[in-house]
Curated annotation (Swiss-Prot):
The keyword Methyltransferase does not apply. The gene is ND6. One of its GO terms (cellular component) is mitochondrial membrane. This is NADH-ubiquinone oxidoreductase chain 6. It catalyses: a ubiquinone + NADH + 5 H(+)(in) = a ubiquinol + NAD(+) + 4 H(+)(out). Disulfide bonds: none annotated. Its EC number is 7.1.1.2. The chain crosses the membrane at residues 24-44, 49-69, 80-100, 139-159. It is found in: Mitochondrion membrane. Coiled coil: none annotated. It is a multi-pass membrane protein. Keywords: Electron transport, Membrane, Mitochondrion, NAD, Respiratory chain, Translocase, Transmembrane, Transmembrane helix, Transport, Ubiquinone.
């Protein structure tokens, strides 16, 4: 149920992304999409560590882009249309009810989840610690190293862009 709600919300954000025309609204849509993707990857894996690292990496890059766009974009007023928010909320409600009515396995999935929650206290902590080892094993260590390289290159780009001696990035006119 949770995965379907996240996927339907992500699809609605994709549709909403096409209607955006202001850079700040596009940035907010991308940040919300990043949150949805990290929640989806977290529900697919045993541990949320990889999704947490991905979220921090993407949000770090988005902060750099946010600073760049706010310094270059003109001082236009950012208006949020109430009608579009109401339409999105109604679409989410309609999609979630349709998914609930069409998928017959949701009720059994909710029962299984409640049974799993009752058994959750009997999990061995040694088994939980072995799931973190998978993050640094051979196939996934490449992803971790690529994230480190990405963060380092982003750090170098920010240091290169923001030179204190040259003043602000945008000239005041």
């Amino acid at each position: 149920m949770m995965k379907m709600m996240i996927m339907s919300s992500s699809n609605l954000m994709n549709i909403n992304f096409m209607k955006m025309n202001h850079p700040m609204s596009i940035m907010m849509t991308i940040i919300i999409q990043t949150l949805f993707i990290s929640m989806m990857t977290g529900t697919m894996m045993e541990s949320f560590w990889l999704s947490y690292i991905l979220l921090l990496t993407f949000l770090g890059g988005m902060m750099v882009l946010f600073i760049y766009i706010t310094s270059i974009a003109s001082n236009e007023m950012f208006k949020i249309k109430i009608n579009s928010i109401i339409i999105i909320v109604y679409m989410m409600i309609i999609l979630s009810t349709l998914m609930y009515k069409l998928d017959k396995t949701i009720s059994t999935e909710m029962i299984k989840n409640s049974e799993i929650m009752n058994l959750n206290y009997s999990i061995n902590f040694k088994e939980m610690s072995t799931s973190l080892v998978k993050l640094y094993n051979n196939p996934t260590v490449i992803i971790t190293i690529m994230m480190m390289i990405y963060l380092f290159i982003t750090l170098l780009a920010v240091v290169k862009i923001t030179n204190i001696n040259q003043g602000p990035m945008r000239k005041m006119s």
